[in-house]
Amino acid sequence: MIRVDKLRGVIAQKNMSQSDVAKAIGITPKTFYTKMKNGVFGSDEIDAMISLLEIKNPADIFFARG
């Protein structure tokens, strides 16, 4: 389960919208919003977001427990 709040914060810090991120990682904005709501992304999508958003500590966002 991902920490959606932290991911939203990183997206905002990069002055991007969720729609921008969706397009950049190759999914539709609707699919991105659904995945955010459910807190589940595929490994390829996670890798793409880590690179795109220059996330330094991905475990804090994408591999959160509980």
Which residue ranges define each predicted feature?
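A short, Lys/Arg-rich alpha-helix, primarily the initiator
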Residues: M1-N15, D20
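Key DNA-contacting residues within the recognition helix of helix-turn-helix
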Residues: R8, Y33-T34, F62
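Alpha-helical residues within the helix-turn-helix
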Residues: A12, K23, S51
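Short alpha-helical DNA-recognition segment
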Residues: N15-T31
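Helix-turn-helix DNA-binding elements, focusing on the entry/boundary residues of the two helices
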Residues: Q18, I46, P58
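Recognition helix of helix-turn-helix/homeodomain-like DNA-binding domains
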Residues: I27-F41
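Short, basic-rich loop-to-helix N-cap that marks the start of a DNA-contacting helix
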Residues: N38-S51
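Short C-terminal boundary/hinge segments that cap the last helix of small helical domains
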Residues: E54-G66
